[in-house]
Design a protein with these regions (language model features):
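Helical segment within the ABC ATPase nucleotide-binding domain
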Residues: 108-123
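ABC ATPase NBD coupling module
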Residues: 1-12, 165
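Conserved H-loop
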Residues: 122-132
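Conserved beta-strand-loop-alpha-helix hinge in the C-terminal portion
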Residues: 144, 148, 152-174
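Q-loop/switch helix immediately C-terminal to the Walker
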Residues: 9, 13-17, 23-38, 50
Length: 174
């Protein structure tokens, strides 16, 4: 399926390196994507209101709503913007591809809190988090963990695998 079709079906992808879209404001991007996802027109005023509430939760300046999508955003701003998109699009399944990449400790906490709030409000939301580091997982507390080596799942279990990986490294599985 094309990415737009996957999005309409309820799949969300937060990329490791979010793309910039010069000329497309965050607000207009979200209006178009929310309308495509729901097949309903959305009031720009209502959308802005929802955006501003989430931007406040994600410690984003409200001016970002009118800036071009990811253009000139720092790494942390791009990641927060992706969580904003995830919140407003209300996907059924989300893939967070190295969402913690390049985040300082404060930004990581804000992003993780946002993801947790989305998951709490949408208990049936499936989230696949791809990461190389334990820090994000410490905040998200995944129910299932899969260890991949060379593209293959070599072990599956609960959060205890995260702790084992952190203390023993991949050597425990090689």
């Amino acid at each position: 399926l094309e990415s737009s079709q996957r999005g309409k079906k309820g799949m969300f992808l937060a990329c490791q390196y979010p793309q910039e879209f010069p000329g497309v404001s965050v607000l207009n991007f979200l209006r178009q994507t929310v309308e495509a996802r729901t097949s309903k027109e959305i009031s720009i005023l209502n959308l802005r209101k929802q955006m501003l509430a989430w931007m406040d939760k994600l410690d984003m300046d409200s001016a970002f709503a009118d800036r071009y999508l990811n253009e000139g955003f720092s790494g942390g701003e791009k990641k927060r913007n992706e969580i904003l998109q995830m919140a407003l699009l209300e996907p059924d399944f989300a893939v967070l591809d190295e969402t913690d990449s390049g985040l300082d400790i404060d930004a990581l906490q804000i992003v993780a809190t946002g993801v947790n709030e989305i998951m709490k409000s949408r208990p049936h939301l499936g989230v696949l988090t791809i990461t190389h580091y334990q820090r994000l997982l410490d905040h998200l507390k995944p129910s299932h963990v899969h260890i991949l080596v060379e593209g293959k799942i070599i072990d599956s279990g609960g959060f205890e695998l995260v702790e084992k990986l952190d203390t023993e490294g991949y050597e425990a599985w090689l």
